[in-house]
């Protein structure tokens, strides 16, 4: 196995993009809230799923855009410099690089995230909820 962004590092595994992935089922099976897992990779981007509830930390990604796709539930994205956006099932929103944001889920939400492989979970902010890329790969 190669260590390119389109294949998992040695000793880790995620879904083969050539095989269908049920994103909602993969997210629902996650044991922990706010702990995304990589399910596929394409063109240097990771496709991640997560199960979330409550408020996440304020953070930004200085060099990367981040796309949120709600699979089940309703997710609010709070911003410091613009009105909040609320997403329902099947809706997505791309948070531009450098924009501070905070995802909020009043009830459990299943979501998919699309972002460059190098994107750090909470940007430069480190909390007990921060997951490394290796952890997101299941290492």
Regions found by a protein language model. Name each.
Residues 59-60, 102-103:
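Short glycine/serine/proline-enriched coil/turn segments at secondary-structure junctions
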Residues 51-52, 61-80, 114:
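Short, conserved beta-strand element in jelly-roll/cupin
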Residues 23-58, 64:
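A short glycine-rich, His/Asp/Glu-containing loop-to-beta-strand
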Residues 1-10:
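Actinobacteria-biased recognition of intrinsically disordered, low-complexity terminal regions
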Residues 43, 71-72, 88-89, 107:
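A cytosolic small-molecule/anion-sensing beta-strand core signal
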Residues 10, 14-27, 40, 106-139:
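Double-stranded beta-helix
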Residues 46, 55, 67, 74-76, ...:
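Structural motif
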Residues 81-97:
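Short acidic-glycine-tyrosine-enriched beta hairpin
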């Amino acid at each position: 196995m190669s260590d390119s962004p389109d294949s998992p590092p040695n000793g880790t595994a995620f879904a083969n993009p050539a095989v269908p992935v049920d994103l909602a089922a993969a997210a629902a099976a996650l044991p922990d809230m706010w702990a995304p897992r990589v399910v596929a990779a394409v063109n240097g981007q990771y496709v991640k799923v997560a199960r979330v509830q409550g408020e996440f930390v304020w953070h930004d990604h200085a060099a990367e855009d981040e796309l949120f796709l709600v699979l089940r539930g309703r997710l609010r994205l709070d911003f410091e410099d613009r009105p909040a956006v609320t997403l329902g099932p099947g809706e997505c929103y791309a948070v531009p690089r450098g924009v501070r944001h905070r995802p909020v889920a009043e009830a459990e939400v299943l979501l998919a995230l699309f972002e460059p492989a190098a994107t750090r979970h909470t940007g430069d902010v480190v909390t007990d909820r921060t997951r490394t890329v290796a952890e997101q790969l299941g290492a």
